[in-house]
Amino acid sequence: PYVCIFSKFFGEFPRKIFTFPQKYDRINREQQNQTQWGSMLTEQEGSSNMVYVTGDLHGDYSRFKRPEMKKLRAGDILLVCGDFGFIWDNSKQEQAVLKKLSEKKYTIAFVDGCHENFDLLQQYRLVRWRGGVARLIAPNIFHLQRGEIYTIENQKYFAFGGGHSQDYEYRRDTGNWWRQEQPTHDEIRRAIRNLNRNQATVDYIITHEPPASLKDCLGVDVQQRLEIHAFFEDIIKECDYKKWFFGKCHMDRFIPMKFYAVFQDVLPVTDERD
């Protein structure tokens, strides 16, 4: 049975995760997000037609030349389930690729994964986008923030990036690992607060990491059970949602009844274009 890792903070975990005890607030006060999200943010809006989801891109522009991408039209939105990878070294070549992406007629919005340069990502300014907070990479490219809920085509999307690198030791030794890949308690608290405001009900969930309880279905091992895994298990039990999309596993597979591992597929969130 899955043991909720949050219990180490305040004893037995409450039956409903969406009411946090004061002790948890005291423990995490020192980890308050230093970025003040408020009046400095500007709203970035627009209309869209279809919403699609794909998996880890790892900075590979050839993915945008695949036949699956041809279905995207002007005004559509492509959601990426982590490891976007096009913001890595700030090289001239990388800037040229980002310029190409910025010329797409559709919007690209991604949650972060484990293989990201978080120092560079955090240099982009925060804006309000579709009811939530995102980092503005380009006029049509947005980095979705952990725990935010976005309203797209009258549907609510809960986004939560980050996770744990399986190649942590190698990447740490080579200087390509960032501590920010692992969600903080403050980010989880913000997510719970936003879910509370929406009565623990969203339409779709976009993450990089899969819920740990799916490991047998996926044929992969979750070697590290971090706070994010406990949090996701409680979302499964406590939240109402239609579909949950995640990357990380580099496979395209549907796990009944609501889970979608995505990699190279470009899946429509809904079945048909209006």
Language model region names:
Residues 107-111, 133-139, 212-274:
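Conserved beta-sheet core of the metallophosphoesterase superfamily
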Residues 47-52, 148-159, 256-260:
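Beta-strand-turn-beta hairpins that frame and shape the catalytic cleft
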Residues 57-58, 84-85, 114-117, 163-164, ...:
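Catalytic metal-binding/acid-base residues of hydrolase active sites
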Residues 132, 139, 152-223:
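Active-site-proximal loop/helix segment associated with metal-binding centers of metalloenzymes
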Residues 12, 19, 26, 36-40, ...:
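Short, positively charged and aromatic/hydrophobic N-terminal segments
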Residues 54, 59-152, 221, 228-232, ...:
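Core catalytic region of metal-dependent phosphoesterases/phosphodiesterases
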Residues 51, 77, 155, 203-204, ...:
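Structural motif
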